[in-house]
């Protein structure tokens, strides 16, 4: 994602030429907090403008149509203008402009959307109750945001669970807004050691992250704004399999939505990821075989503790290989053994054997991180141990990890993606409605 900042700068420069007056005399762009939120063009039709951290060290405004799946990172221009190009991170030519109407406190109340060869469309901002919150897991204080419809009613809740890496409350894209638009109260929080949360992410294990998720559920359960016994989990990637571990230890969890999370042993997932990424980037069979041999050897050393000297020699000889950036690696035997014990040896499907709530799992057929067929098979078998047949899975064609439309799944296609998988929002909405109906009957 190194090109994100450059492309956004290009879009901002292009926008400056659209100003009716010189940019220096234009009002400052609105803060992201003042314009971010959910907008509606007509009953049942919603647009998410989410504050989004794509990993480049800055927050951006992300436009998502919660019907069609159209998704764009927006760049600020002069005054109240934001705009986007023809694809997610492709800034030019400009194809969409957004301008805001604001109240006396500078909060956006509505927006006007202008697209090429289309009539201007107006969207009203949906009133939401957004609160900064903190909760604790032991000595670790975690900070986040709780958002719900501003109607004074109690709402079912959703706790969002992160994928791997130093992610924060702004890492989920449009998914929190989707749930809020459907009447849920949504808790997002900064992963320990990121944002405003305390703790040390590098020193944490999956067990720590599961405990953080449990603490989030307990915090939400104690809120007077939440319907008792109606808190679900939505996890992305690694968060998708952490959701099972959280629910296994908290039978009150009402449902799980697994967004492209893997349910195979982590070592197996890493082998799949290595091969799938290299094939998507058209590496040769010999390069793929060499990479898989390295990862297999690495895991054997991590498991047994024997053979580090030989592995380290291979590491030193392989740093210029084409496949090097696609494989896991450790700096010492102690580090490798730690990761084997706390990560690579973990089988996420085991906690699922204790889960009795409804489960929805959504994947892209071109996912280069999650082995989709094996994951679905393992999820179904694990849930059967708990006599849980309330399992629904769906695999979207031409979608990758993250459910963006792609051609091969290669990471360099992400900036050029134009939308999330068609029928994603309809699939989620339909399943949530059916789950709610079952609870009422």
Predicted region positions:
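Peripheral terminal and inter-domain segments
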Residues: 20-136, 150
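Short beta-strand element of the alpha/beta-hydrolase
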Residues: 154-163
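The serine-hydrolase catalytic nucleophile loop
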Residues: 165-177, 191
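Conserved alpha/beta-hydrolase
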Residues: 179-196
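Alpha/beta-hydrolase active-site loop
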Residues: 204-224
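Accessory cap/linker subdomain of secreted extracellular hydrolases
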Residues: 257-354
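Short beta-strand/loop motif that positions the catalytic acidic residue
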Residues: 355, 361-363
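Catalytic active-site module of serine/aspartate enzymes centered on a nucleophile-bearing elbow/loop
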Residues: 399-402, 408-441
């Amino acid at each position: 994602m190194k090109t994100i900042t450059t492309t956004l700068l290009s879009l901002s420069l292009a926008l400056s030429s659209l100003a009716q007056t010189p940019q220096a005399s234009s009002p400052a762009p609105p803060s992201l907090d003042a314009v971010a939120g959910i907008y509606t063009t007509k009953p049942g039709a919603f647009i998410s403008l989410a504050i989004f951290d794509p990993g480049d060290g800055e927050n951006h405004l992300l436009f998502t149509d919660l019907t069609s799946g159209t998704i764009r990172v927006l760049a600020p221009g002069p005054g109240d203008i934001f705009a986007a190009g023809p694809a997610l991170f492709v800034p030019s030519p400009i194809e969409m402009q957004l301008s805001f109407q604001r109240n006396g406190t500078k909060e956006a109340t509505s927006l006007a959307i202008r697209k090429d060869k289309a009539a201007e469309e107006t969207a009203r901002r949906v009133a939401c109750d957004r609160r900064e919150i903190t909760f604790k897991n032991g000595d670790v204080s975690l900070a986040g945001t709780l958002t719900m419809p501003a109607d004074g009613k109690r709402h079912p809740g959703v706790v969002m669970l992160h994928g791997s890496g130093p992610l924060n409350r702004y890492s989920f894209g449009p998914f929190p807004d989707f749930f809020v638009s459907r009447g849920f109260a949504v808790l997002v929080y900064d992963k320990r050691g990121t944002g405003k949360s305390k703790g040390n992410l590098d020193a944490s294990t999956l067990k720590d992250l599961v405990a953080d998720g449990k603490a989030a559920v307990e915090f939400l359960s104690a809120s007077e704004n939440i319907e008792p016994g109606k808190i679900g989990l939505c996890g992305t990637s690694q968060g998708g399999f952490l959701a099972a571990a959280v629910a296994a230890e908290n039978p009150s969890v009402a449902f799980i939505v697994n967004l492209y999370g893997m349910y195979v042993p982590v070592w197996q997932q890493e082998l799949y990821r290595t091969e799938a990424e290299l094939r998507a980037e058209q590496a040769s069979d010999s390069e793929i075989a060499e990479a898989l041999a390295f990862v297999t050897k690495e895991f054997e050393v991590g498991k047994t503790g024997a053979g580090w000297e030989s592995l380290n020699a291979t590491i030193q000889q392989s740093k210029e290989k084409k496949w090097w950036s696609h494989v896991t690696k450790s700096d010492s035997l102690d580090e490798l053994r730690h990761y084997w014990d706390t990560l690579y040896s973990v089988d996420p499907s085991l906690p699922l054997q204790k889960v009795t709530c409804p489960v929805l799992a959504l994947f892209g057929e071109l996912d280069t991180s999650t082995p989709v067929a094996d994951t679905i098979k393992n999820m179904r078998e694990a849930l059967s141990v708990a006599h849980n047949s309330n399992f629904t899975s769906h695999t979207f064609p031409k979608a990758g990890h993250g459910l963006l439309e792609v051609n091969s799944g290669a990471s360099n296609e992400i900036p050029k993606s134009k939308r999330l998988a068609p029928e994603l929002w309809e699939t989620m909405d339909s399943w949530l409605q059916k789950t709610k109906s079952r609870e009422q009957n």
